[in-house]
Amino acid sequence: MVSFSSLLLAVSAVSGALAAPGDSTLVELAKRAITSSETGTNNGYYYSFWTNGGGDVEYTNGNGGQYSVKWTNCDNFVAGKGWNPGSAKTVTYSGEWESNSNSYVSLYGWTQNPLVEYYIVDKYGDYDPSTGATELGTVESDGGTYKIYKTTRENAPSIEGTSTFNQYWSVRQSGRVGGTITAQNHFDAWANVGLQLGTHNYMILATEGYKSSGSATITVE
């Protein structure tokens, strides 16, 4: 397979021969639709797009902290922009999201030692992602009430390959797309009910879809 970096070098050589500096060719390449799992940096933000390959999913990096994703009859994907490593930061974002089925918008990330996948969910469709999870309490943050949950995934995909690991959830009870998420409040609340995080890996303002269709455009500030 020809790598994108090799393609970019080839296009750079051609554009240098055919166009003046400042030509928009490379800018448009940077906004290409991504359809298979990929991570990287874009405009100073870390981005992550993971898909298990089912259905049609297109992820596109926009200007600054913006990204868009469209999906039709997907199986499972997670996509977004943020930071690597993550931290107990305050995140402000805005955007639009449309999906009346199994999809959600969240501050999403991973830690290692212990391996934990976490979600601070601001909006979900007609399926509550905490279904079947163990409820441990609530946390008041950023003008809303979030319920705290824990689940365990066995032999599931992770940043360390197929593994067994815990998921921590904060799920906002009055959904919204846009606002501020104070991660420290959730991390503290989780610790208070015995949910310990490890060393931060990446953190993104994510859109996730599971066996659904929809679209989202999100900007991290």
From Swiss-Prot:
GO terms under cellular component: extracellular region
Signal peptide span: 1-19
Catalytic site positions: 117, 208
One of the Pfam families matching this protein, by short name: Glyco_hydro_11
InterPro entries linked to this entry: ConA-like_dom_sf, GH11/12, GH11_AS_1, GH11_dom, Glyco_hydro_11
Pathway(s) annotated for this protein in UniProt: Glycan degradation; xylan degradation
Domain GH11: residue ranges: 33-221
Catalytic reaction list: Endohydrolysis of (1->4)-beta-D-xylosidic linkages in xylans
Superkingdom of the source species: Eukaryota
Entry keywords, A to Z: Carbohydrate metabolism, Glycosidase, Hydrolase, Polysaccharide degradation, Secreted, Signal, Xylan degradation
E.C. numbers: 3.2.1.8
UniProt feature coiled coil, ranges: none
Main EC class the enzyme belongs to: hydrolase
PROSITE patterns the UniProt entry points to: GH11_1 (PS00776), GH11_3 (PS51761)
BP terms from Gene Ontology: xylan catabolic process
SUPFAM superfamilies in alphabetical order: Concanavalin A-like lectins/glucanases (SSF49899)
GO molecular function, a single term: endo-1,4-beta-xylanase activity
Compartmental location: Secreted
Similarity comment text for this entry: Belongs to the glycosyl hydrolase 11 (cellulase G) family.
Annotated function: Endo-1,4-beta-xylanase involved in the hydrolysis of xylan, a major structural heterogeneous polysaccharide found in plant biomass representing the second most abundant polysaccharide in the biosphere, after cellulose.
Protein name: Probable endo-1,4-beta-xylanase B
Natural source organism: Aspergillus oryzae (strain ATCC 42149 / RIB 40)
